[in-house]
Amino acid sequence: MENRRQDYILRVRYHNPLPPPPFPPKLINIPNPVKQYALPNFVSTLVQEKKIPIENDIELGMPLDLAGITGFFEGDTSWMHSDLSSVNLDPIDRSLLKVAGGSGSTHLEVPFLRRTEYISSEVARAASNRGNLRLTASTSKALAEQRGRSLREVPKQLEAINESFDVVQQPLEQLKHPTKPDLKPVSAWNLLPNTSMAGIQHLMLRVADDLSERSHSYSSLVNLQEGHNLTKRHEVALFMPSSAEGEEFLSYYLPSEETAEEIQAKVNDASADVHEPFVYNHFRNFDASMHVNSTGLEDLCLTFHTDKDHPEANQVLYTPIYARSTLKRRHVRAPVSLDAVDGIELSLRDLNDEESLQLKRARYDTFGLGNIKDLEEEEEKLRSVEGSLNEELSEEEKPAESREQLESAEQTNGVKPETQAQNMSASESQANSPAPPVEEGNTQPSPVEQLQNEED
């Protein structure tokens, strides 16, 4: 039996409260004779010591005779692909065709203090997890690629949109997970985009370093044990981009505890009596690495809105995350420049007219597609159109008012308004009616003409 040496390693976990040194390490100038290798006398001596025979022909040792390749000038490329159908592999070589990582050893290096039943259960759990992860990853990736290829055409996109309406009407018990059929749905939510946050780029910020101020006080130890490492100071912290010697990084600024409480009071109540400006002090520098999401929907921020009285109105608003950024503590590499900002004074003010207009327009134009001046001109045009419509409506209401005055006057004279209106309309029609036309063949003689005819 093979004997394996196992060492017992005890890992001591403790906090190191020592801060980093406030000064960079001392740079020592070590003489290095690098320049002598570029001198011409050194190269000449090197050539004399080591003679390398190089005999090259016209083709530099690589003769190319394309005429010897059959079918090359006719475009036949079958000579580039070798025929492997007639090759018989040796049984020993067939083992090389197995997929790497398909089967491996389940032996785990464990310390001698672990019990055997724990080791066996861990081996079985690790094997099952590897298989499930591999199957899930391959299946989900294949489904995503297949769906992406199928949705490249517009008719397929319309079909997918219509299918989404059918799925919403489908009973909850009939829903199935595409890759995990054992899961059963419990409740359904309406997934909708968060239009109020559509015009803003959101970043997922992850700090790899501990931001808590470590100390040996009793309160800090209690907060560390309870998990309250961050105080109110970090809730109102500021990031400022900085640069030094061609390198860019982020500077982190924090206020005091009292200032943080005053800032929150000022934000919650604009009329709060606080001392401005608020002073921020430099706390730490961070190196940032950013990964921009290619598709735009790799990371989503979900906001749940629950309605207990109407469960069908439950909504989940999603906001796409533009990029993920990781902040790591920046170590001191060079002397601190005199241009570094040690503190920031912050003052809060009310919104001006343009900013308030932008805030109001953001409710209807979340993407910021319209210009402020153009929007103001449109609003003025709408107001002028509304004014003209109001004038037309007022002119239409004037005859109605005169009609009411006429009716009231007729009632005082004892005449019914309906009969008087009919008489007025009849007289007006007679006065305004044209005379009947006179035909030429049916003209009647006047009385003078009749007397003359009788005397004759």
Curated annotation (Swiss-Prot):
Region of interest (Disordered), residue spans: 382-456
One MF term in the entry's GO annotations: RNA polymerase II complex binding
Principal place of residence: cytoplasm
Localisation: Cytoplasm; Nucleus
Assigned keywords, A-Z: Cytoplasm, Nucleus, Phosphoprotein
Annotated signal sequence range: none
Presence of keyword Cytoplasm: yes
Entry's Gene Ontology cellular component terms: Cdc73/Paf1 complex; cytosol; nucleus
Disulfide bonds listed in the record: none
GO biological process, one term: heterochromatin boundary formation
Composition bias type Basic and acidic residues, residue spans: 396-406
Domain of life: Eukaryota
PANTHER family: RNA POLYMERASE II-ASSOCIATED FACTOR 1 HOMOLOG
Family, per entry: Belongs to the PAF1 family.
Record's protein name: RNA polymerase II-associated protein 1 homolog
Organism encoding this protein: Schizosaccharomyces pombe (strain 972 / ATCC 24843) (Fission yeast)
Organism phylogeny: Eukaryota, Fungi, Dikarya, Ascomycota, Taphrinomycotina
